[in-house]
Amino acid sequence: CRTDPTAAKHKGISILIVDTRDPGYSWTPIILSDGAHHTNATYYNDVRVPADMLVGEENGGWKLITTQLNHERVGLGPAGRIAGIYDQVHTWASKPGSDGVTPIEQDAVKRLLGQIKSIWRINELLNWQVAASGETIAVADAAATKVFSTERLQEVGRLAEEIVGGYGNPADSETAELLVWLDKMTKRNLVITFGGGVNEVMREMIAASGLRVPRVTR
């Protein structure tokens, strides 16, 4: 909340912990496109918070917010998300289908799996770069990791569905289950493109903070 109304817009902000038992606090669930419920919209009506619920320094909230956002952006871009899709599809493709054909023996399947694995490895390098930076993560590095991973995840989902949908038989129970899982992952992974800040804003942050390009005038 703003604790110094006279300060500049990024100053005078403090973080306070709100007791959710306060009668002025309420929430409603946010249901995602895949039907999952991971987060909520919260509301504060005449909520009063004791001063001893302050987190960190008074008027020092913006630094905490930006630090948390950097960690959130990195957390939204782990290589493990892509690795999980690759492992599931690679395992499926390595088994003979109901027609006796093993999908991974097809050149097109090998090529598509290779594309997924190359994206996975690049994402790993970005993760390692951020991990090597220590406690202080550069804004541009966190944003770049998030943009690359969340957008490449959409591509990985399409490639995976192309493999399973194109070289599998949906009448086969294992293939059908994998297609349902991939569909859920595709919908769920779309949401993270705007978690921690939409990617259009992330690109501006990369340009301004990482490349020192003048900020866009608004």
Each PLM stretch: what is its role?
Residues 1-28:
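A short core secondary-structure module
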Residues 94, 98-104, 110, 120-175:
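C-terminal helix-coil-helix/basic helical segment that borders enzyme active sites and/or dimer interfaces
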